[in-house]
Amino acid sequence: MVVLAAVAEFIPGLAKWRLLGQTPNGATAVLPRLAEHKPSVGESALTEESRGDSSNSRPETTRPASAAGVIAATQGAAVSADSVESKPPPVHLEYSQDRALAHFYQALKRTSHTEAAFTTRVVHFGDSLIASDYVSGTLRRLLQKQFGDAGHGFSLIANAWPSYFHEGVSRFATSGWLVSRVVGPYAQDGWYGLGGVSFRAPVNTLARVGTSTKGEFGRRVSRFELAYVAGPSGGAIRVRIDEKTVGELSTQRDEKAFKTARWQVVDGPHEIEFLTTRGTSRLFGVVMERDVPGVVLDAIGIQGARLRFLDQQDDAHYATQLKWRNPDLVIYEFGANESADGLAYSLKDFHDTMKAVVDQQKSAIPESSCLVIGAMDRATRKGDTVTSSSFIPLLVAEQRAVAQEVGCAFFDTYQAMGGRGSMPRWVRRGLGQADLTHPTAVGADIIGTWIYRALMERWQ
C-alpha cells in the first residue's frame, strides 16, 4: 500500500515509505536521485494500487520530527507551523507591478462577502513537494480556514507516482492504468490534462474519489467533475455514487475532444466510483467542489518536473485546461530539479523557457494573478563538510527576474529560510530532510504558512 511520505517521517515502522529523508537510529537513508529527463514516447503501466485515504493523512497540525542522523548530530530549537502562523513572514512578497495580485484579492473579497457562493480558485503547480501536497496542503487548509472550504479541487484519477498524495480527500484506484506524463513517457498528441498526466484505462479498471473522513477540511462535496478525452477509440464507464449506479458515461465520439462530466449531489460526505466496462477510456482527473463561498486549491504536483516541462503540453490543449479551471491565482513552485541540472542547462535557457510557460498562462487566462515561489537552499555533503550550493542564488535571481518581467508576485524562500547555509540548519532542527534538498512535513508546513502570511499581509 502506498503511504504518504509525511506519515512515514513520524512512524519508524513506515521508514521505507518515506519520500526522502532519514532512517531511524541515525542511519543515512538510501535516497532516490532527483529525476533526470529522459524523453521517450509511449506509456508505462501502473503495477500498484493507488491509495490515499484519511488513515494516511498528515495531522492538520504537525510537530517537528526528531533530528536523528549524521548531519543533525544535535537537536536544534523546536519549531512548528503553529508558532509562525500568527507572525509576519520573514520576507515579504515582491512586486514589479502594484496590481500583480489584484485579481486574486478581488476574488477573495467577493468570497468573503459570500457573494452568491463565489469560489476563489487557486492552481498550484510544482514538483515532488506538491505531488505529495507539501506546502500546497498547508496553503489550502489556511485559506479555507480563513475564507471557507469550497471543496478539495483537482486530483489525478490514479497515483502517477508512488509518493502522490492529497490531503483532505479519499482516493483509490486499481493497478493496470497506462500512463503518459509530461516528464515521460510522452503522449504522442501532447494531451496531459491539467495534472500533466494522461491515463488510459482498459476494461475493468476502477477508480474511486471521495470526501475525507478525518479532520476539519474536505468532509463535504456538492459536485464531482470528471475530466476525460472523448474520441473514436473511446469506451464506456459505469458511474456509481455512494455505491449506487447512476449511469454509464460513453467516451466515444467521432472526433477527439477534451470533455468534462458533472454529477451534482446534496452537500455532504460522498464517494464517486468509475469502472471501465467497454473499450479503453482516457481520463485525467476528478474535481470536487461545493456550492458554498470559499477557496479551492488544485495542487498540480509533477514528480521530477522542471517548470519548463509544463511546455510539453500541446499549446491549445493546455490553454483549454487553464480556461476550464479559470483560477484567480496561479502559483509556480519549482527549483529542486533545476538545481540538480546546474549550469548544464544555461541560465538564459532557464529564463526564456520559464517566461514562455508563464506567458502561455497569461495568454490563456489574462485576468489571473500569478505568484512565483523561489527555490529552497540546497546543500551537498563530502565527508564531514556540508556546503550550500552556489547555484541556488543564481537560480533564484532568474526566478525573481522572470516574475518581475511578466508581472507575477515573488516569494523568496531561500532568504526566508536564512539564505546560504540554511538547509543544514533546517536538518538539525527537524525541518529539512537528510538529502539536504527537501523539507520535512514540518518544514513544508512552515513554508506554506509563510506564503499564506505573506499573501494575507497585503489582503489585510
Region spans (language model):
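Hydrophobic membrane-insertion alpha-helices, especially the h-region
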Residues: 1-12
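Catalytic His-Asp segment of secreted/periplasmic serine-dependent ester chemistry enzymes
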Residues: 17, 315, 377-460
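Alpha-helical scaffolding within the catalytic cores
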Residues: 96-110, 310-324, 352-360, 394-396
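Active-site-proximal beta-strand/loop segments in catalytic clefts of secreted hydrolases
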Residues: 125-128, 157, 299-303, 332-337, ...
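Conserved SGNH/GDSL esterase-like catalytic core that processes O-acyl groups on lipids
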Residues: 130-352, 438
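Conserved N-terminal glycine/acidic-rich loop preference
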Residues: 326-339, 348-355, 360-363, 371-410
